[in-house]
Amino acid sequence: MIEWNIKSTTRAQQGLYEYDAVSRLRDSQLGEERVHDVANYIRKGKLWQAFEADKKVVLLIDEVDKADIEFPNDLLQELDKMEFHVYETGETVRAINRPIVIITSN
């Protein structure tokens, strides 16, 4: 099971991935080699982890009511199509095995 515990500051994008532009800028200023591959600065979210799992997993999105009112709507397309686009790399992430998604609310 993959658990995604929602807080009042959680954004839907965090469940997909986060791009660390600040670290990439710092590395470019330091002349780091890793700066040439943008994938080094992508942190996979819980939805991405569930989509790329080798076997069927359960994704628990816990206490969705704590987030902004638009939070559930922001994930509808990704959960319906079981895929999303990573703009920084041009990659489309598709579910290998469709996860079982459980969403809880208080």
Regions found by a protein language model. Give the residues of each.
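AAA+ P-loop NTPase catalytic core and its hallmark functional loops
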Residues: 1-106
